[in-house]
């Protein structure tokens, strides 16, 4: 069993690719490693396509094994279950740059499985998985126009940093992933701390340049370990049928694409397609049948040719707009009375209903992954129900696309969010897409910014998002602002940019063709900035600053600090004291290890009551001070008196009266209120009290000290 190993340097790290020792029955299997982070990537393809298959069934699975970090999974089963959101996002990150590189017409099933088997917490496994996938596909023999290289780029102290560690990313103003071939960028995914367009473009170019070392190494690895390429040829085009379909439907498709309303346009295209089927069916000889899937594919190609040709020739777009025009905008805030914050953002035929909900730290999301357990205080969920595109469909748990779009919107907003210290709330945003015709994720960014401001969340600035498209025919190209769903489907690029008036906060790019130059990206960024500023201007007319008051239905959070040694007194035995406090005051109380207490209440009176009770619980008794107390228990040698919540002291029989006391019950009864003087608090916290000295003392009774 002879393993083939390839090592190469990538920035500060050494990358190792190994094949031939593990998973030898897969078409391609590579153990990719950077430092102690290792990912096993396998690729298997079916030699024969399913009969009637009309799409490319590529599946990418990314899975993190807890043993990779020396941990045992939680839960009853103690094993990994369905992919979490993080795993789903990385699976999409791998899928996006490799999918365009399979040849047109290739519809054989291909499955990529990336399994994290060892992890160094400082080296993220996503880049290792991407590099491993590229290498595994390259050596598999499956038709693939790779390899690709992928890098992560940070921006620290004005310098680009290649593949920064997790610690370096904490200081970085940028987290950008770029993937591409030796001569083209295919995919960009990023989050930024309000950076200028030229810095973002520079990061893309830098990352692509650095990825060349990966591509070169994988080519050398393939030369040594690669399997013969499959003997596959693309199915021959049915030219005569294409010409026949065009002769029947070209004019009607052209007319349909001059209809600006999406629903009406869809109906017109349906009529044209039905006519094609009817005409061709009438011309069939006896015993012949019509391949409706093939007809549908040819009809789709005709649509694409007509729309792209018009745009490239300088004609107006499908809905009558110029290339840089934005659809009509409509913005409303505070639309739902009981939510903490809400907004409806409408751009043409795309609409998002967005809500913001405030909660306590206890409401934050607990994430258990390879790096350990940590809390997520800002959650953004994106829902794309079938009715938003006028269809019926399955409604249930979120699909990969919904998870990805929600994450993109969240990354676009993250840079302007307050810290937990500045605003001690957990925040959940939900974007319900109620209409969709292109760029619903960017509508979610705009709606989120509006809903957060409506909720009174002190975000640093308004954020807007825009989706750009591209039509490139030979040397001609047109960059489109605010693309429709059809333009996304028929175009060559999906380029999404979110940001404030001051710069970019998120950038996502997916390119379907090679040849996207730096010039094209520069024009797209410039056009996107103009569009973003226009949208921000409209949004600011609706709401330009966070509401000064929170919703009356939102919890108010008050913060106080107690000495760490007093934490146990507030919690009580088995949590009894804090449970009693929350029940009696109607508040939610959270205590940090450093003694910070957060009290959440829907009204100020409840919070003030809870604060007062906690101050009493944590107050230090002062020797010589007189307190008002209540007798709670009588014993033969005296009585126990409660002087502060949770604090009892003993009045010895000799300290009850100036007269001789033979029987305690002759002078005191349970529930009786008395004034007592603190004589002593010993090392164990036991308190000696005196009624006699309180009566003799001339000092006035003191209220409970509020030393907290």
From Swiss-Prot:
Cofactor: Mg(2+)
Function in brief: Involved in mRNA degradation. Catalyzes the phosphorolysis of single-stranded polyribonucleotides processively in the 3'- to 5'-direction.
Predominant localisation class: cytoplasm
Catalysis: reaction(s): RNA(n+1) + phosphate = RNA(n) + a ribonucleoside 5'-diphosphate
Name of the molecule in the record: Polyribonucleotide nucleotidyltransferase
Organism per entry: Pseudoalteromonas translucida (strain TAC 125)
Gene Ontology molecular functions: 3'-5'-RNA exonuclease activity; magnesium ion binding; polyribonucleotide nucleotidyltransferase activity; RNA binding
GO biological process, one term: RNA processing
Family statement: Belongs to the polyribonucleotide nucleotidyltransferase family.
SMART domains in the cross-refs: KH (SM00322), S1 (SM00316)
Keywords: Cytoplasm, Magnesium, Metal-binding, Nucleotidyltransferase, RNA-binding, Transferase
Subunit structure: Component of the RNA degradosome, which is a multiprotein complex involved in RNA processing and mRNA degradation.
Record-annotated KH domain positions: 555-614
EC assignment: 2.7.7.8
């Amino acid at each position: 069993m002879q393993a083939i190993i390839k090592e190469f340097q990538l920035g500060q790290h050494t990358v190792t690719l190994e094949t031939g020792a593990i998973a030898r029955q897969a078409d391609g299997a590579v153990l990719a490693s950077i430092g102690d982070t290792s990912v096993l990537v396998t690729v298997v393809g079916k030699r024969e396509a399913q009969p009637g298959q009309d799409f490319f069934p590529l599946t990418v699975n990314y899975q993190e094994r807890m043993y990779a970090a020396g941990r045992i999974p939680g839960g009853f089963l103690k094993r990994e279950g369905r992919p979490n959101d993080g795993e789903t996002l990385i699976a999409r990150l791998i899928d996006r740059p490799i999918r365009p590189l399979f040849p047109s017409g290739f519809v054989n099933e291909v499955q990529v499985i990336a399994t994290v088997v060892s992890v160094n917490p400082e080296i993220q496994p996503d880049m290792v998985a991407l590099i491993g996938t590229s290498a595994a596909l390259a050596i598999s023999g499956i038709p693939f126009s790779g390899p690709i290289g992928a890098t992560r780029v940070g921006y620290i102290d004005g310098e680009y940093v290649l593949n920064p560690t997790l610690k370096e990313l904490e200081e970085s103003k940028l987290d950008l992933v770029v993937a591409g071939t030796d001569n083209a960028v295919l995919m960009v995914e990023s989050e930024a701390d309000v950076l200028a367009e030229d810095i973002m473009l520079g990061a893309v170019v830098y990352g692509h340049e650095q990825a060349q070392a990966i591509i070169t190494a994988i080519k050398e690895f393939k030369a040594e370990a690669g399997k013969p390429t499959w003997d596959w040829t693309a199915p021959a085009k049915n030219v005569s049928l294409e010409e026949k379909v065009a002769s029947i439907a070209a004019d009607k498709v052209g007319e349909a694409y001059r209809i600006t309303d999406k629903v009406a346009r869809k109906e017109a295209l349906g009529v044209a397609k039905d006519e094609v089927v009817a005409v061709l069916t009438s011309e069939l000889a006896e015993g012949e049948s019509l391949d409706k899937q093939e007809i549908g594919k040819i009809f789709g190609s005709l649509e694409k040719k007509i729309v792209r040709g018009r745009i490239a020739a300088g004609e107006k777009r499908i809905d009558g707009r110029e290339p840089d025009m934005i659809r009509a905008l409509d913005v409303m805030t505070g639309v739902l009375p009981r939510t903490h914050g809400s907004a409806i953002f409408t751009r043409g035929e795309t609409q998002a209903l967005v809500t913001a909900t405030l909660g306590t730290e206890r409401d934050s999301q607990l994430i258990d992954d390879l790096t350990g357990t940590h809390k997520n205080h800002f959650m953004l969920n994106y829902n794309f129900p079938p009715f938003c595109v006028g269809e019926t469909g399955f409604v249930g748990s979120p699909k990969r696309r919904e998870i990805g779009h929600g994450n993109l919107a969240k990354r676009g907003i993250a840079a302007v969010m307050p810290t937990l210290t500045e605003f001690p709330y957990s925040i959940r945003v939900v974007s319900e897409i109620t209409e969709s015709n292109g760029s619903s994720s960017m509508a979610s960014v705009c709606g989120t910014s509006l809903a957060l401001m409506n909720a009174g969340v002190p975000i640093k600035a308004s954020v807007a998002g825009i989706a750009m498209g591209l039509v490139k025919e030979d040397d001609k190209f047109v960059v489109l602002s605010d693309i429709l769903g059809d333009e996304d489907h028929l175009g060559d690029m999906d380029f999404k940019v979110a940001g404030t008036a001051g710069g970019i906060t998120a950038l996502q790019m997916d390119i379907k063709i090679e040849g996207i130059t730096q010039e094209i990206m520069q024009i797209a960024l410039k056009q996107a900035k103009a569009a973003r500023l226009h949208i921000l201007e409209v949004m600011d007319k609706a709401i330009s600053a966070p509401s000064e008051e929170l919703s009356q239905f939102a919890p108010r959070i008050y913060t106080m600090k107690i000495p760490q040694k007093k934490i146990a007194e507030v919690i009580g035995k088995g949590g009894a004291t804090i449970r009693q406090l929350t029940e009696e005051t109607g508040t939610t109380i959270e205590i940090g290890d450093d003694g910070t207490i957060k009290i959440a209440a829907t009204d100020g009176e409840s919070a003030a009551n809870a604060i007062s009770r906690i101050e009493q619980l944590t107050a230090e008794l002062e020797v010589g001070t007189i307190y008002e107390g209540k007798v709670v228990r009588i014993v033969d040698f005296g009585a126990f008196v409660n002087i502060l919540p949770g604090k009892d002291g003993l009045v010895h029989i000799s300290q009850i009266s100036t007269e001789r006391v033979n029987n305690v019950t002759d002078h005191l009864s349970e529930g009786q209120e008395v004034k007592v003087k603190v004589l002593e608090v010993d090392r164990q916290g036991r308190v000696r009290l005196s009624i006699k000295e309180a009566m003799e003392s001339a000092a006035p009774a003191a209220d409970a000290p509020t030393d907290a």
